[in-house]
Amino acid sequence: MSTVSKLQFGDDWPFTREEVMLNCRADGAWFVINPATLMQYPLNEIAMKQMESGKVKAQLIDVILLPDPNAPEKKKSVEVIQNAIKLLCESN
């Protein structure tokens, strides 16, 4: 598990919170965790399936995503966060 913040990602930061925790699980599921509430948000397909099946308590990540400034009807991309968690998972 690792904490990341807006300071590290600048304008690419996709979240409404200033910092979040990234959790890379042994089964390959990736979750973003809100440190204030400990709510989990799935970041990949494995995590999404676990949420949908009720295996884990989580919410859709859209809840904590900022609007895309170039397309306000859409949410910001989480690609930079997915890249960061991939590196985290590979190093553990």
What are these regions (language model features)?
Residues 55-92:
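C-terminal partner/receptor-binding element of secreted or periplasmic proteins
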